[in-house]
Amino acid sequence: MAETAYIPRLREVYDRDIRSKLTEQFGLTNVMQVPRLDKVVINMGVGEAVNDRKKVELAAGDLALIAGQKPIVTHSRKAIATFKLREGQAIGAKVTLRKAKMYEFIDRLINVALPRVRDFRGLNPKSFDGRGNYSLGLKEHIVFPEIDYDKSGESWGMDITVCTTAATDEQARALLTAFNFPFRQ
């Protein structure tokens, strides 16, 4: 009895609709030229970690709930006296999502988290890096439903970078628009 593997909803949409639409739109001949999502990197910098090391552990725990996998604690590369920062001190956490977890996270980001952001007017369409990757920042991590604000107690910001295989920003924008990223007009 063969079990069918779980395929995330957005992956099915990409395979069924988006891939053929992008192939037609950009006149691509090779299947491997079609832009696709590569990975999502979520970074959470904890500025208060200079005074209290427990804050990084709390942030890493919340990031694990959001991402669905254990984050890596990031450390400072050099000492900065004005910030009372020593070399090698824990200052944040990051996680890299690929494949199924990446599609699940993007689905939750677009359909659940972004609509819960206060005064949300759409994503900035100029936040592409020139190589087909898109970055956005959230001021509060509590917009994700996995986080209970009463238990978390604090609110940290996070940087989210969506890496694609697109060669240009135009292709990446078309790919993310097809995934229903709410870009500002």
Swiss-Prot record:
A single GO cellular-component term on record: ribosome
The keyword Ribonucleoprotein is annotated on this UniProt entry: yes
Disulfide bonds: none
GO molecular function per UniProt: rRNA binding; structural constituent of ribosome; tRNA binding
Domain of life: Bacteria
Keywords: Ribonucleoprotein, Ribosomal protein, RNA-binding, rRNA-binding, tRNA-binding
GO terms under biological process: translation
InterPro entries in the cross-refs: Ribosomal_uL5, Ribosomal_uL5_bac-type, Ribosomal_uL5_C, Ribosomal_uL5_CS, Ribosomal_uL5_dom_sf, Ribosomal_uL5_N
Residues in the signal sequence: none
Keyword hit for Ion transport: no
NCBIfam families recorded: PRK00010.1
Described purpose of this protein according to its UniProt entry: This is one of the proteins that bind and probably mediate the attachment of the 5S RNA into the large ribosomal subunit, where it forms part of the central protuberance. In the 70S ribosome it contacts protein S13 of the 30S subunit (bridge B1b), connecting the 2 subunits; this bridge is implicated in subunit movement. Contacts the P site tRNA; the 5S rRNA and some of its associated proteins might help stabilize positioning of ribosome-bound tRNAs.
HAMAP family (alphabetical): Ribosomal_uL5_B
Family: Belongs to the universal ribosomal protein uL5 family.
Oligomeric form and interacting partners: Part of the 50S ribosomal subunit; part of the 5S rRNA/L5/L18/L25 subcomplex. Contacts the 5S rRNA and the P site tRNA. Forms a bridge to the 30S subunit in the 70S ribosome.
UniProt protein name: Large ribosomal subunit protein uL5
Species in which this protein is naturally found: Afipia carboxidovorans (strain ATCC 49405 / DSM 1227 / KCTC 32145 / OM5)
Gene name of this polypeptide: rplE
